[in-house]
Amino acid sequence: MSAISSLVPSRFLTLTAHLVIVITIFWSRENNVLACLPINFTPQQFSSRDTELIIALSVTLGLFAVEYAGFLSGVSMFNKTQSLLSVGAHASATVSLLFFLFEGWDCSLYWWIMSFCSALPAVTEIIIFIAVFGWKRKPL
């Protein structure tokens, strides 16, 4: 299998691995919320940070929907540039979020991980959607 033809399964696997880790963080977000708070915190501070993390994770799930829609519909499945960007971003996100989950990183770091590793590929996916459906160009 050549390097180009292996981008499609690699993209699917890294996208799915990133999705699984985001869902895992959703289920066990209490430890990460506690890592964001000072030692003496109020229930209101906990609730505020928990809501912030829920919003960030929900935005990430929305960005996954955009990427899966473009990928599974075939619009960007064979686009080499998008596949390479997506594989790199989601592999980086997978590793970063594993550290975020197990090391108890601060919640504000999640926004950085989301913006570079989820929002960037989703924005390029939207650009490909516009090029294909709006300007009637080939997806390759």
From Swiss-Prot:
Topology of this chain in the membrane: Multi-pass membrane protein
Positions bearing carbohydrate: N79
InterPro entries according to UniProt: TMEM107
Cell compartment(s), UniProt: Membrane
Top-rank taxon: Eukaryota
Principal localisation: membrane
One Pfam family hit: TMEM107
Organism the protein comes from: Xenopus laevis (African clawed frog)
GO CC terms of this entry: membrane; MKS complex
Keywords associated with the record: Cilium biogenesis/degradation, Developmental protein, Glycoprotein, Membrane, Transmembrane, Transmembrane helix
GO biological process: non-motile cilium assembly; protein localization to ciliary transition zone
Record field: transmembrane: 7-27, 53-73, 84-104, 113-133
Protein name per UniProt: Transmembrane protein 107
Function according to Swiss-Prot or TrEMBL: May play a role in cilia formation and embryonic patterning.
